[in-house]
Amino acid sequence: MKEKDNFEMIINLRKIKTGKRTGRSKRAVKFIKKVVARHFNAEKVIIDPLLAKSISKNGNDKIVSKIRVVVSKIEEKIYLVRLAIKSR
């Protein structure tokens, strides 16, 4: 199987949006960590601060519904999640 060193994925945050209004951005960051850990079998997931800020750009209770991220492998079972920049 091919090793996933640099991988781009879209994470749907709609389930987080349907939940309780308070603390949505914090739950979204935890959800992103959980999804990346599940897909890449990671022990540690590091979230870029720019990604955390872009999730809650309209406030902590008004998060985006989908987010495109790039997952990069730092070391064995340690991954960095960054915001993907659209290129056209």
Curated annotation (Swiss-Prot):
Q: Which InterPro entries does UniProt cross-reference here?
A: Ribosomal_eL31, Ribosomal_eL31_dom_sf
Per the record's keyword annotation, is Ribosomal protein included, yes or no?
A: yes
Q: Name one GO molecular function term.
A: structural constituent of ribosome
What are the entry keywords? Answer: Ribonucleoprotein, Ribosomal protein
User: Which is one Gene Ontology cellular component term of this protein?
Assistant: ribonucleoprotein complex
- The source's domain of life comes to Archaea
Name this polypeptide is given: Large ribosomal subunit protein eL31
Origin organism is Saccharolobus solfataricus (strain ATCC 35092 / DSM 1617 / JCM 11322 / P2)
Recall the taxonomic lineage recorded for the source organism: Archaea, Thermoproteota, Thermoprotei, Sulfolobales, Sulfolobaceae
